């Protein structure tokens, strides 16, 4: 176990270290980081999306605690869901994808179970490939009367995969796992231009190294800014609590 990583981004958050007897009287809301296990080029770890979602969730939980009144329930960070729909990366070793349908069912059953004792559920998503499953699961949970929503770890103008954006954030939250001697620019074409080839052959069809963007420009300072933007956006969406038709917090 990488102790430095776990000091920065605990895999077990407050929910994981709580006891069952502590929960019935609190009726907490929970933040569930949702990531993936997939290639992130030659320089970032397979759990990059999970690290980011967990770090954002941790920071959001802290911020939400500061907004509570005495009569409001608290927010707990759940242990992350570290597997998602990553079929576009399947050509690369290390990728483990459970597919959109399996993920949808997992999230649906997770939400049904957690809603038995939790107030609100927020999935904090760190991987774009999970969106289809999230939409289907959270839409169903809300149709069943459960107060669920989801938010993405997004940044305006960010590149697509293992490039400047994700590498900068990792340099901020987990610098020890970034292999800076292996940084190499990938395909930086706009995602819209790449989509036809991506759909046919996955990421390997457009980037042999698995990078979409340019990680060579990444810095920890930029990562701090991007990370703060992700946290601010998620906090604002939760505070407004206006889920759209697909359950995404707007």
Swiss-Prot record:
Disulfide bonds: none
Catalytic activity as recorded in UniProt: [mycofactocin precursor peptide]-C-terminal glycyl-N-{5-[(4-hydroxyphenyl)methyl]-4,4-dimethyl-2-oxopyrrolidin-3-yl}acetamide + H2O = [mycofactocin precursor peptide]-C-terminal glycine + 3-amino-5-[(4-hydroxyphenyl)methyl]-4,4-dimethyl-2-pyrrolidin-2-one
Cofactor note: MftE appears to bind one Fe(2+) and one Zn(2+) ion per subunit. Fe(2+) seems to be catalytically active while Zn(2+) could play an auxiliary role.
Top-level taxon: Bacteria
Record EC number: 3.4.14.14
Keywords: Hydrolase, Iron, Manganese, Metal-binding, Protease, Zinc
GO biological process: proteolysis; riboflavin biosynthetic process
Stated family: Belongs to the creatininase superfamily.
Known function: Peptidase involved in the biosynthesis of the enzyme cofactor mycofactocin (MFT). Catalyzes cleavage of the MftC-modified MftA peptide to liberate its final two residues, which consist of a cross-linked valine-decarboxylated tyrosine dipeptide (named 3-amino-5-[(4-hydroxyphenyl)methyl]-4,4-dimethyl-2-pyrrolidin-2-one or ADHP).
Protein name: Mycofactocin precursor peptide peptidase
Organism encoding this protein: Mycobacterium ulcerans (strain Agy99)
Organism taxonomic ancestry: Bacteria, Bacillati, Actinomycetota, Actinomycetes, Mycobacteriales
Gene: mftE
């Amino acid at each position: 176990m990488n102790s430095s990583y776990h000091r920065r981004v605990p895999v077990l958050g407050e929910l994981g270290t709580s006891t069952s007897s502590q929960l019935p009287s609190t009726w907490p809301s929970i933040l569930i980081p949702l990531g993936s296990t997939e290639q992130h080029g030659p320089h970032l770890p397979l759990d990059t999306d999970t690290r980011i979602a967990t770090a954002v969730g941790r920071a959001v939980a802290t911020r939400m605690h500061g907004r509570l009144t005495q009569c409001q329930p608290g927010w707990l960070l759940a242990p992350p869901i570290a597997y998602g729909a990553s079929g576009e990366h399947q050509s690369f070793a290390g990728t483990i994808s459970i597919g959109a349908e399996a993920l949808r069912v997992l999230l649906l059953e997770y939400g049904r179970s957690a809603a038995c004792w939790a107030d609100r559920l927020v999935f904090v998503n760190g991987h774009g490939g999970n969106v289809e499953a999230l939409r289907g699961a959270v839409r169903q949970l809300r149709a069943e009367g459960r107060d669920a929503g989801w938010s993405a770890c997004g940044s305006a103008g960010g590149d697509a995969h293992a490039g400047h954006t994700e590498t900068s954030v990792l340099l901020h939250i987990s610098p020890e796992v970034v292999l800076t001697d292996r940084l190499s620019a990938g395909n930086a074409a706009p995602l819209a231009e790449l989509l036809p080839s991506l759909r046919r052959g996955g990421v390997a069809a457009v980037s042999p190294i698995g990078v979409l963007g340019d990680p060579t420009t990444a810095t920890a300072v930029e990562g701090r800014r991007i990370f703060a933007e992700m946290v601010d956006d998620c906090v604002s969406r939760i505070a407004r609590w206006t889920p759209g038709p697909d359950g995404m917090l707007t």
